[in-house]
Every structure is written in C-alpha cells, then in structure tokens.
Amino acid sequence: MITLFQIDKSGSDIFEKDYSVILLVNKKEIYGTNIPQKIKDELVSKFKKGEMKITGTSEKAKKNRFRIRFHTAIIISLMEQAIKDLGYLDDVNIEICNDIDGHFHEIKYMLFKQFTKLIPSLKLEDIVLTKFQKPSLIDDAGKTFRKNDKEKLKECIQIALNTERLYNIIRK
C-alpha cells in the first residue's frame, strides 16, 4: 500500500507569529504544529553565532538557507511522528505544496537523506512539488493551526517540537 504524505504551511514566513506546518497522512490524519517563538528565538541565536554549519555566497543566501533547513526540519519532525504512529511503510509518496518558499531541491534532498534508511523503497521521484486545491482538508487544517482553533485542534495530532532535535537536523 502507498502512504501519501501531503505537506503545507499556513503563514507567509517561518519567523512570523502563528506560522504553522501541516502534514496530512492518506488524506485523513492531520499532524501539525504552530512553531513556538521560543524555539524560533533559540535557533536564530544559534544561527547568528555561526553554530549551524550553514554556508552561502552571502549573508542573505545563508539566511535563506537557514530558513529552508528550519522549515524542512519541522517537516521531518512531523513525518517522524506519523511514521512512528503508522509503523512499517511499504511505499511512500510525498507531496509538498508549491507555496512553501525556498529551494525545492534542497527540501527534497533533506527529506530523502533523512528517510531512505527508514523507508528503503523511497526514491527521489516520490517527493514532488504540487498545488493543493482550495478549499481542501489540508488548507483548512493549516488555518486551524494558525488560528489556534482549540475545538478543531482536538481532531488533529499536535506535535511538540524539540529545539535540540531541530538544531541537529538543520546542522546535518
């Protein structure tokens, strides 16, 4: 059986208030997180101190790369929890919304590198960029997390982020 992971975000910039990342599994289970400001502040501080091993041709390029890697680390955290909940996976398709800012190839390679041991059948072509319909379940879920709708959040699996885990993923 093929497991479908669909990834979207709600908000225009990862560093803005109430920015959320959503993972929809098989068009049913909703995983998500609203990134706490404390985690953003701690990771930005480490980045500014040069602790992230992020390279770039300019400061702007480094900052963009940090933004992409931070975003991808959150996606990885959501997927790790979903995979843990699902158990063994045969085949996987990963659809990433095209409104996620950044370089798709870097997101794709980070996901591939992170999950090839866990999902041996995963191929680079299984990770694609797509546009999700609006309205849709994933779009509604993004709004639910962004607005912190407590009633609707009861139907979702909320992931608590770990600063050290994100830091280690970003640095890889």
State what each model feature region is.
Residues M1-I14:
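Two-metal-ion RNase H-like nuclease active-site motif
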Residues S10, I35-K38, N98:
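Short loop/turn segments at strand-loop or loop-helix junctions that form parts
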Residues G11, E29, I100-G102:
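Residues that cap or initiate secondary-structure elements
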Residues E16-K17, H103:
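Short, function-defining helix-loop hinge/capping sites that tune catalysis or transport
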Residues Y19-N26:
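Short beta-strand scaffold segments in enzyme catalytic cores
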Residues K27-K49:
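Short glycine-rich, Thr/Ser-proximal phosphate-binding strand/loop in the N-terminal lobe
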Residues K48-I83:
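Acidic helix/loop or adjacent segment enriched in Glu/Asp that either coordinates divalent metal
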Residues T72, I76-K172:
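A two-mode feature
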